[in-house]
Amino acid sequence: MNFDVAIIGGGLAGLTCGIAIQQRGKRCVIINNGQAAIDFASGSLDLLSRMPSTSNGESRTVENLKENITALRNELPAHPYSLLGAEKVLAKAQDFERLANELHLDLIGSTEKNHWRVTGLGSLRGAWLSPNSVPTVQGNELFPHKRIAVLGIEGYHDFQPQLLAANLVLNPQFEHCEVTSGFLNIPQLDELRKNAREFRSVNISQLLEHKLAFKDLVKEIIESSQGAEAVFLPACFGLENQEFMTALRDATKLALFELPTLPPSLLGMRQRIQLRHKFESLGGLMINGDSALNATFEGNKVRCINTRLLEDEEITADNFVLASGSFFSKGLISEFDKIYEPVFESDIIGVEGFNQKDRFTWTVHRFAHPQPYQSAGVAINAQCQVQKCGQFLTNLYAVGNVIGGFNALELGCGSGVAVVTALAVADEILAK
């Protein structure tokens, strides 16, 4: 099978890159092994939430994105943002904002500055873009609603309203609020309660989506809110989009918000579903349940790859994009004595002091400190071309968290790196 572009990985980075390429008339295939990290994510995207930790482990919160992305180059020269340059990073971030609006992802936020989003435990976390159904505040501004009801679902343990309510008022932006907690009694879910393993957000949303007892659910929310102006609910209402939540909001006449639960996350899954629909509607091909095994090279180019299900048939392309993610999605593999990228055997880099073949450099003794192994990934240049044996391959690019030289967990930049590098690589390929 021959394509213009073959992308390995169907997560946020792979789908974003694929959409941008398909929109310009190229023939693209995505080899997707299964669920991606986006399926377990909060639905909020971070461009850069924190600067690198100081020597004593203290992190520095980012508010002004442009200023801090520019400053990042001095502290982490191998970070993808440093390689691309602040101007290009912000331009690609704005391109993604336009794409998100086009796809009706219902995201709020901008590259001007970060905002705070409420987490499932009641703390505040910096974000670049968040679903408009998630409660957010700007800087030190007070939350606009004074009386808040946090409502869980009886028998559903992936969302704890009492804990969230107690933590929420500890934040200065919510100190003025009167926060109560309670549970919704939804008889339609009794069948799921018989098996705790099936009582998850996805199963709940699938059952409720038919709206067989919609009026009863509306009545239960109104009664349980006890006169509150705003209601915080677990993200269990509407699998593919926000239409169910919008219908509930209109029917209850309340300010309804949803919060991410323990994974799998409905908010992240919605985004992947919408991105995939867009990619396929543009004519892109998704090969699901398959994984790339190895590659054949000709000089400094990749000629083809072989996959697990199509091992007798080569996939050839003019350009290849590695969007396989980090350890979570097996884009990187860790063995006792080495960390490696399994498909192309690309060169691996990390933060200063990290050595992929020296296990003692992978961790630091303080558990809560950023761990060096989390910065491992493939080496790239300013065009996001992948390095192998010290040489950059001319038709192999890397996007997202498979790239090394930065710790996405420490910096809060994983989603930003995914979409920025994806759109930058799409531009590089289309310019050829």
Curated annotation (Swiss-Prot):
Q: Which GO terms describe its molecular function?
A: glycerol-3-phosphate dehydrogenase (quinone) activity
Q: Which residues form the signal peptide?
A: none
Q: Which cofactor does it need?
A: FMN
Extract the coiled-coil ranges from the record: none
Q: What is its EC number?
A: 1.1.5.3
Enzyme's top EC category = oxidoreductase
| Record-level GO cellular component terms | glycerol-3-phosphate dehydrogenase (FAD) complex
One GO term (biological process): glycerol catabolic process
Q: Which UniProt keywords apply?
A: Flavoprotein, FMN, Oxidoreductase
Give the catalytic activity: a quinone + sn-glycerol 3-phosphate = dihydroxyacetone phosphate + a quinol
Which pathway does the record list? Polyol metabolism; glycerol degradation via glycerol kinase pathway; glycerone phosphate from sn-glycerol 3-phosphate (anaerobic route): step 1/1
Please state which protein family the record places this protein in.
Belongs to the anaerobic G-3-P dehydrogenase subunit B family.
Reported function: Conversion of glycerol 3-phosphate to dihydroxyacetone. Uses fumarate or nitrate as electron acceptor.
Assembly:
Composed of a catalytic GlpA/B dimer and of membrane bound GlpC.
UniProt cross-references to PANTHER family, sorted A to Z: ANAEROBIC GLYCEROL-3-PHOSPHATE DEHYDROGENASE SUBUNIT B, FUMARATE REDUCTASE
From the Swiss-Prot or TrEMBL record, give the protein name: Anaerobic glycerol-3-phosphate dehydrogenase subunit B
Q: Which organism is it from?
A: Haemophilus influenzae (strain PittGG)
